[in-house]
From Swiss-Prot:
Residues holding 8-oxoguanine: Q32, S60, W71, F157, P183, D219, W223
The protein's name: N-glycosylase/DNA lyase
Positions of the UniProt region annotated as Helix-hairpin-helix: 129-193
Domain notes: Contains two alpha-helical subdomains, with the 8-oxoguanine binding site located in a cleft at their interface. Contains a helix-hairpin-helix (HhH) structural motif and a Gly/Pro-rich sequence followed by a conserved Asp (HhH-GPD motif).
UniProt GO BP: base-excision repair
Length: 252
């Protein structure tokens, strides 16, 4: 059942946003972007940086902590440890097995790492630059190697984080494609219930088309502010007049 009044309010709010606002949210507000910037600056290997980001993305579910803290743990660890193509999978599995924030379903997650590592080992920085301009192709290949649907949470999330990592490495912004759907995690599912009990992916696809903002960028707008430790005061000066509309998202 749909709450049409709330949906109309949501669409009115998103009428004030665009892709550039989502980019601002990503680069100035999303702590996951910050920790990737810190990690990139502490590593001397951009190719390995992107590969590690993809590996971490495909096991970022059923966490024992928040997504923000999990990515902070990832960044801190790999700023002090090395990996290369010969030991990429083994090195990452060692990190995963000893992590604090990701202890559930380890056997399943390790199998995912084993499936995707051969694909990543054969890629170089030029390949990643090509994928950055064709993220739907990356989605297709990740889906194939992981034997997962293209709209599965970790596959689309991996593309999102790959986009972050590539933006940082190549210092260039490519918007996410309209055809790549929102990662359906617990925050998004819970928030969607304010508007409808239908499939969150279907609902946010409709919002995306109306607002003319790709679903992964919509995720960047709503996901951070739904976090339980989100500090609105710290971001007010970074978002000018759009701050009040962002605040309204939490009041619906």
């Amino acid at each position: 059942m749909r709450n049409l009044e709330k949906i109309n309010e949501l669409l009115e709010i998103f009428g004030h946003f665009d892709v550039n606002f989502a980019k601002t949210m990503e680069e100035k507000i999303d702590t996951q972007y910050f920790v990737l910037e810190n990690l990139k600056n502490s590593m001397n290997n951009d190719e390995m940086f992107i590969k590690l980001v993809i590996l971490n993305s495909i096991v970022s579910y059923q966490l024992c902590t928040t997504g923000e803290l999990w990515w902070e743990e990832f960044s801190k660890y790999w700023s002090k440890h090395d990996a290369n193509n010969e030991n990429l999978g083994e090195s990452y599995v060692n990190f995963l097995e000893n992590s604090k924030g990701n202890k559930r379903l380890l056997n399943v997650k390790i199998k995912r790492i084993e499936r995707i590592t051969p694909f990543l080992e054969n890629l170089n920085l030029l390949d990643f630059k090509t994928y950055y301009s064709d993220m739907e192709k990356l989605l297709e290949n990740l889906s194939k190697y992981l034997n997962s649907k293209k709209n599965s949470k970790t596959v689309v999330f991996a593309v999102k984080m790959f986009g972050y990592a590539s933006r940082i490495v190549f210092n260039e912004f490519f918007p996410y494609p309209m055809n790549i759907e929102i990662p359906k995690d617990s925050r998004i599912e819970k928030y969607t219930l304010k508007f409808t009990d239908e499939n969150p992916i279907k609902f946010w696809n409709e919002v995306s088309k109306t607002a003319k903002i790709p679903p992964l960028h919509i995720d960047s707008i709503i996901w951070p502010v739904l976090g339980r430790n989100f500090d609105f005061k710290s971001c007010e000066n970074k978002l000018d007049e759009n701050f009040r509309y962002l605040l309204k998202l939490t009041e619906l």
